[in-house]
Amino acid sequence: MKIVHCVFSFGIGGAETMLIDILNEQSKTETVSLVIVNHVYLDFLLEQINPAVRIFKLRRQKGSYSPFPVLKLNWLLYQLNPDVIHVHSSALLRIIALRAGRGLFLTVHDLHIPLEHAGRGTQLIAISEAVKADIQQRTGRMAMTIPNGIPMDKIEKRTRRASFVGKNMRIVQVSRLDVEKKGQDILIKAVALLKERGIENIEVDFIGEGRSEPRLRQLVQEYCVGNQINFLGLCDRQYIYSHLKEYDLMCHPARYEGFGLTVAEGIAAMLP
């Protein structure tokens, strides 16, 4: 079977993490390709994909209205002649013309994703029961639930018992720095509140990057908790999987989530 996965970009996120695993597993038995439409991708992530997967980069400039990338995408799909086209953004359905006689799937990776371009011929996949319920409530359509998976054997396990005598309690949060969704500001304010109450043996590491980093750093200064909050920046999955065990607690103060893949990774590392 020939399977083509289509994405606009390939950066840091739960969808990309999941897609890497899917590509690697499917390529063991099927002919698999990945098409990245925009000129937005991280090479170190692409290096984690099995070389058997063919990767096509169309290098469209994000936000471009040029018709040439659209034509290039459809010409490529025509040449690949896949049995299955699997898209990971509903907006891609607006520009893909090659559909007849092929399985067309859309994985909905979060809550509140617009689905006006997903016709009745598109089979919807939800990453959680919450996403499935959201789809049904907004559109009346039924989706198939396939929960995100994680490679349990690659995540090192925490074995020591928590003890905070004479040392800090280490807390980790792994996600894009986006206060509107991921809620890092809530955790910073909680640390500041505990400091006001005389509890200062708490250290928080934020792993990730994003548009809210300047705002979060300013918040850290305003609350005078700079000695307790660390911004570690972007770390690859190998680093995260080998270092989660060093923490005492994972905190994910998201305001909403479709699934929360990093929470599952924390549980796999035996973190409370």
Where are these regions (language model features)?
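A conserved mid-protein helix/loop that constitutes part of the nucleotide-sugar donor-binding site
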Residues: 13-21, 169, 178-195, 204, ...
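Short His-centered aromatic/hydrophobic patch
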Residues: 65-69, 86-93, 108
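Short glycine/serine-rich donor-binding loops of glycosyltransferases
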Residues: 260-263
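Short alpha-helical donor nucleotide-sugar binding micro-motif in glycosyltransferases
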Residues: 77, 234-235, 242-247
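Nucleotide-activated donor-binding/catalytic signature segment of Leloir-type glycosyltransferases, i.e.
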Residues: 217-235
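N-terminal strand-loop element at the rim of the active site
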Residues: 5-68, 210-213
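Carbohydrate-associated surface elements
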Residues: 130, 149
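Aromatic "clamp/platform" in nucleotide-sugar-dependent glycosyltransferases that forms part
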Residues: 255
